[in-house]
Amino acid sequence: MKEYRVYLERARSRQQDFLYPLIFREYIYGLAYSHIDRSIFVENGGYDNKYSLLNVKRLITQMYQQNHLIISTNDSNKNPFLGYNKNFYSQIIAEGFAIVVEIPFFLQLSSSLEEAEIIKSYKNVRSIHSIFPFLEDKFTYLNYVSDIRIPYPIHLEILVQILRYWVKDAPFFHLLRLFLYDFCNWNCFIPTKKSISTFSKSNPRLFLFLYNFYVCEYESIFLFLRNKSSHLRLKSFSVFNERIFFYAKREHLVEVFSKDFSYTLPFFKDPNIHYVRYQGKCILASKNGPFLMNKWKHYFIHLWQCFFDVWSQPRTININQLSEHSIQLLGYFSNVRLNRSVVRSQMLQNTFLIEIVSKKLDIIVPIIPIIRSLAKAKFCNVLGHPISKPVWADSSDFDIIERFLRICSNLCHYYHGSSKKKSLYRIKYILRLSCIKTLACKHKSTVRAFLQTSGSEELLEEFFTEEEEILPWNFQILSLICHSKSFTSHGFHSNRIWYLDILFSNDLE
């Protein structure tokens, strides 16, 4: 049991037990100010005129007084005591909460990275594309996969209670609870998706922290049982209702279930199971049959219902055979394709035909969603036909080409790990022709006349030459679009390169 206690230890010595005083530090709100959209401050008359730490302190004081004549969630967004926009100050305080509560977790993360001696390769650790080399190495040996949607909404009171285990500061969480209930209007017992959407848009930093913390908490329990529990018999997960007393309950878990329940569900350790999470979904893949996958399915359902009080339907978890199911992950469609080949073998005077089945991970670019995104950004219509972008016509020719180059480079870098490159050719064609039509629209000319204009071809050639310097050698073949040549390079079609330094994708704008 000592081993389990060490495994679940939350580095108590590093915990910041006094976060409450930081709420009243002016530099915290200086950091919060820099994270909020500037458009909000334009409506409020500017930072120097209306934002001050004194107003924030007054607003916090009124939260404790419970005076609904001063602070309320009625139809008025104006605080009569402060005279300014209440939503503006609630967003400032939410940013302050997010910055303060992130401090102990950031210190713990930095310390753990230094101890593991992986700080030098931290970029690859953060990379979203590092998932795909993992899939290529592991998924071809697996048979079944389960698509899981992480359920939400979860009540904020449960998040606050779980967060209290990490940071021992009662006044801070009392103030956080008052803020969430008074300003976020989450007094209902079960928050709706509409309220969560409103909260995520008005306070994105705090919302992302609370959501990621919720996911991290359920994954810590899942990984603990996955890595440390073997031949564990359990039927219900109600024993995990209080996270603080997890150690004692875990110690007597097997004994309690063996005595109190006449029927128990065997739970065996699976060494060939793999777990991948991306945004609000996760993937569970295993080499074993569907019987064990169904056990994990019921485990997740009971975990969310009993520990987080989140209702999860069994239909949100689908179990499929990997060779017959495509996984939508990180903007790709991934599946395992079976390649069958026949080998003729001859021994003395006898000839044998041997059928060999090999597995290959196919990662395909979903061209239809990309065309929808390009159409939404006004680069083409819904059918994928390129159109001009007159909004950019006021910019210089160099700026227009640079914008198209940046978008094209981002898309090509991101989808360069695809097994088939035909979709990339079409994306390149749409952006290139949209660029030409935009330039022709700016100069009030036709596409043909613009291309025949002196210096235009050199300008476009410089545009694609700059791209060749950015992309690797096997991607330079895309520059042939400018010269209307075909794509027959076998190396470009077969090679696959994952850019592990991609941390996020830019908007199409």
Swiss-Prot record:
GO terms for cellular component: chloroplast. GO terms for biological process: mRNA processing; RNA splicing; tRNA processing. One of its GO terms (molecular function) is RNA binding. Coiled coil: none annotated. Keywords: Chloroplast, mRNA processing, Plastid, RNA-binding, tRNA processing. It is found in: Plastid, Chloroplast. Usually encoded in the trnK tRNA gene intron. Probably assists in splicing its own and other chloroplast group II introns. This is Maturase K. It comes from Trifolium semipilosum. The lineage of its organism: Eukaryota, Viridiplantae, Streptophyta, Embryophyta, Tracheophyta. The gene is matK.
